[in-house]
Amino acid sequence: AASDVYKRQNGMVFVSGQLPIDAATGQMAEGIEGQARQSLENIKHILEEAGLTMGNIVKTTVFLQDMSLFAGMNGVYATYFDGAFPARSAVAVKALPKDALVEIECIAVR
């Protein structure tokens, strides 16, 4: 890949966009709920590697293949935060790598 999975700068951790691919198997999850869950699990593991948790996230950007997928993504997304949601942008894009339905990136603060 042409970028690191995350970069640390001035107490902030910038996590690259995470496709819904299981690192162990290389397989892409099925459906929007499964894909949202896998993208968020990838973020969770990256943050743990950086010594942080999902609670440290201050901003997410969600890229969706189609805005009609928003509700399915949002239902899963809500389960990853204890009511204290980070700021978020959700954007529909023309296409995502590997024909994924969703890609999620974030910024976390120590």
Region spans (language model):
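Short, small-residue-biased leader/transition segments that mark boundaries at the very start
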Residues: 1-6
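Short, well-ordered amphipathic alpha-helical segments that serve as non-catalytic structural scaffolds
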Residues: 34-48
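Short acidic capping loops at alpha-helix termini that bridge into adjacent secondary structure
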Residues: 53-58
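Glycine-rich N-terminal loop/short-helix segment of MobA-like nucleotidyltransferase
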Residues: 19-30
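Short, conserved loop-to-beta-strand elements that form functional interface hotspots
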Residues: 73-103, 107
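Short coil-to-beta-strand
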Residues: 7-19
